[in-house]
Amino acid sequence: MTGFGARLVEATSRRGQLCLGIDPHPELLRAWDLPTTADGLAAFCDICVEAFSGFAIVKPQVAFFEAYGAAGFAVLEYTIAALRSVGVLVLADAKRGDIGSTMAAYAAAWAGNSPLAADAVTASPYLGFGSLRPLLEVAAAHDRGVFVLASTSNLEGATVQRATFDGRIVAQLIVDQAAFVNREMNRSFHRSEPGCLGYVGVVVGATVFGAPDVSALGGPVLVPGVGAQGGHPEALGGLGGAAPGQLLPAVSRAVLRAGPGVSELRAAGEQMRDAVAYLAAV
């Protein structure tokens, strides 16, 4: 399997920059006339898999699956496999973060050979970026990606992420540490091709004030908060000094509200994909 960065570049060049979310919130299940049970969850995901099969990358929100216990995790495993079987990259939005052997166990689950392992996973660095080392090592060994939370769109996040340490805000420190990992990986494999993305990305909310500088990251930037959370697709160009093709806008509710019809859901996704298509060149 080729590295995650290369797979992402190939997928987005053919299928666009948009990352679609699968967020099976109970309110959405009810709006789709589905029961708020594991069976309803499975039906919701089946519709999403069919509608999103032509897109580059899809992001299931793990918490909404966890809420149904073992049955929910079974649906998540099936959904990850179904999406990947039709050529869609899967980003598991699990936001895992811990230390030592516990982090190593999370790494095995989400970036190793577990049925839950996707193409990439989100992670929290707020026990120290170094605490992510087990996850980063396992992801690299299995050609998977890691998106590290840097500057999130929730207001509470700023109390930590905009604090200053070593002359930089914490969000910038996280980006810089992710950039270091990508540089080391490229050096190890003698990669220097223009447009080549590393396997460590960061998460920067679409609505944050003063986004960190991602120009030296060398990896993708996931940009949640577009649509229902107030981020405007047309306002993302050059966010944080990003290069063309580096930003990956993430949209969930703004598209999912078009369901449950597969054609309507697909059309809503395509409309949003068209709205962010300019990011491939800006």
Curated annotation (Swiss-Prot):
<keyword id="KW-0456">Lyase</keyword>
<dbReference type="GO" id="GO:0044205">
    <property type="term" value="P:'de novo' UMP biosynthetic process"/>
</dbReference>
<dbReference type="GO" id="GO:0004590">
    <property type="term" value="F:orotidine-5'-phosphate decarboxylase activity"/>
</dbReference>
<feature type="active site" description="Proton donor">
    <location>
        <position position="95"/>
    </location>
</feature>
<dbReference type="Pfam" id="PF00215">
    <property type="entry name" value="OMPdecase"/>
</dbReference>
<dbReference type="InterPro" id="IPR001754">
    <property type="entry name" value="OMPdeCOase_dom"/>
</dbReference>
<comment type="similarity">
    <text>Belongs to the OMP decarboxylase family. Type 2 subfamily.</text>
</comment>
<keyword id="KW-0665">Pyrimidine biosynthesis</keyword>
<dbReference type="InterPro" id="IPR013785">
    <property type="entry name" value="Aldolase_TIM"/>
</dbReference>
<dbReference type="InterPro" id="IPR018089">
    <property type="entry name" value="OMPdecase_AS"/>
</dbReference>
<dbReference type="GO" id="GO:0006207">
    <property type="term" value="P:'de novo' pyrimidine nucleobase biosynthetic process"/>
</dbReference>
<protein>
    <recommendedName>
        <fullName>Orotidine 5'-phosphate decarboxylase</fullName>
        <ecNumber>4.1.1.23</ecNumber>
    </recommendedName>
</protein>
<dbReference type="InterPro" id="IPR011995">
    <property type="entry name" value="OMPdecase_type-2"/>
</dbReference>
<comment type="pathway">
    <text>Pyrimidine metabolism; UMP biosynthesis via de novo pathway; UMP from orotate: step 2/2.</text>
</comment>
<keyword id="KW-0210">Decarboxylase</keyword>
<dbReference type="InterPro" id="IPR011060">
    <property type="entry name" value="RibuloseP-bd_barrel"/>
</dbReference>
